[in-house]
Design a protein with these regions (language model features):
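Residue-level detector of functional hotspots within protein domains
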Residues: 4, 310, 351
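Short, charged juxtamembrane terminal tails flanking transmembrane helices
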Residues: 371-374
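Generic N-terminal leader/processing signal
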Residues: 194, 368-369
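N-terminal signal peptide c-region/cleavage motif recognized by signal peptidases
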Residues: 13-15
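A short, hydrophobic C-terminal helix/tail in secreted or cell-surface proteins
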Residues: 351-368
Length: 374
């Protein structure tokens, strides 16, 4: 098995260099107003936010068939499943400590439905799985952002996933897989006076707080159906600089993504991954600019700007890759020639079937290993 793993990693790292992408510009609600794509499903429907000049606000939107549609609420859409159910949060995204956010779900037939809170004033939905189970965070009774709690929403009810320390604790749910496993972060004691680290809730809702980095911070962003977790964190040697990281469900740190070329300790982030184990995010280059990235082997990052022809697209750079679906389509945000933020979707040319095949084989090996050690 070890030999197969080494061979597979070699195949992935060498074949990936031949992959290129076509870019689809995801139009804004208002001309060249800012827009950001945050997630997509396997049908190619994309969600995020876009500036509406008529309301002078960022609004939750989805893109389908080349068209952008507002959900009719402010804020942003953050997740979508293959049934086209969308989740997100309303409110002012530019506020560091929002006082007006509400978690919602949206369907084409039912429109926007608010999910409620845990007794407090605010909530935000971050992700939804194939069964329609939602995670995010909400304020408890008498609480605020510094005491928010991760939640699971199913069968019409929101339930707290708890904190490490009660009642002063803090937690957030960011990603969920089809088994109902959730990842995010939590504080050891409270928000301001203790470290915050990767937290994993198993399918039964049991909280596991993992301090597996040498630094004082880590967070999980997404978990795939094989139990691989991606996110970001700090290391003691590099201070407050954050790096993309990969863990298993036992909290073992599998990889830390260096900056492009493995030099400079400039920082990176892993935002999401698919079931083939392909990871997307960004790395910081020598000019301190964010560059959208993809990793086929879970170890090495590729600057997506080097495998996409931006000529005639209106983009000068692709800055962050936020999500990837089963077909390898990638969505994110870049900088347009007028300086505004623009949403994009990338499709591999041709679709690298061999890469997904070998990636799936690797994921299968990881799954077998997981079953042996859990």
């Amino acid at each position: 098995m070890k030999s197969l793993l080494v061979l597979s990693l070699f195949f992935l790292s060498t074949t990936a260099s031949a992959v290129t992408y076509n870019l689809q510009v995801l139009q804004s609600l208002s001309g060249t107003g800012d827009s950001t794509a945050l997630a997509l499903n396997d049908n190619g429907t994309v969600v995020g936010n876009s500036y509406n000049s008529e309301t002078a606000q960022l609004e939750s939107v989805y893109w389908s068939g080349g068209s952008v549609t507002s959900l009719g609420v402010t804020g942003t859409a953050r997740g979508i499943n293959n049934s086209d159910t969308i989740v997100g949060e309303t409110g002012n995204l530019g506020t560091a400590f929002p006082v007006d956010s509400q978690a919602y779900s949206y369907t084409a037939t039912g429109g926007v439905a608010y999910l409620g809170t845990l007794g407090g004033s605010n909530a935000a939905a971050h992700a939804i799985n194939s069964s329609g189970v939602i995670t995010g965070y909400a304020y408890p009774t008498g609480g605020n952002l510094l005491q928010s709690q991760a939640f699971i929403y199913q069968n019409g009810a929101m339930t707290s996933l708890g904190t490490v320390s009660s009642p002063t604790g803090y937690s957030r749910g960011h990603g969920i897989n089809d088994a109902g496993e959730i990842v995010g972060r939590a504080s050891a004691i409270n928000f301001g006076g203790s470290e915050k680290h990767l937290t994993y809730w198993d399918a039964s809702g049991n909280l596991n707080f993992y301090n597996s980095t040498s630094g004082n911070y880590s967070t999980g962003q997404q978990i795939n159906n094989h139990g691989t977790i991606v996110g970001n964190g700090r290391e003691a040697a590099t201070g407050n600089t954050q790096f993309g990281m990969v863990w298993d469900v036992n909290g073992s740190l599998l990889n830390v993504f260096d900056s492009f070329g493995g030099t400079g300790n400039l920082g990176s982030r892993a935002w999401s991954l698919n079931d083939a184990g392909v990871i997307v995010g960004y790395g910081v280059d020598a000019s301190s600019a964010k560059r959208a990235s993809v990793s086929y082997d879970g170890v090495n990052m590729i600057d997506i700007n080097t495998v996409v022809d931006l000529t005639g697209t209106g983009f000068v750079s692709l800055d962050e890759a936020h999500d990837i679906n089963a077909s390898g389509q990638i969505v994110g945000v870049g900088t347009r020639s007028d300086g505004s933020a623009g949403a994009f979707m990338l499709t591999a040319v041709p679709v690298p079937a061999a890469i997904w095949l070998f990636g799936s084989a690797l994921a299968g090996l990881a799954w077998l290993r997981r079953k042996a050690i859990v």
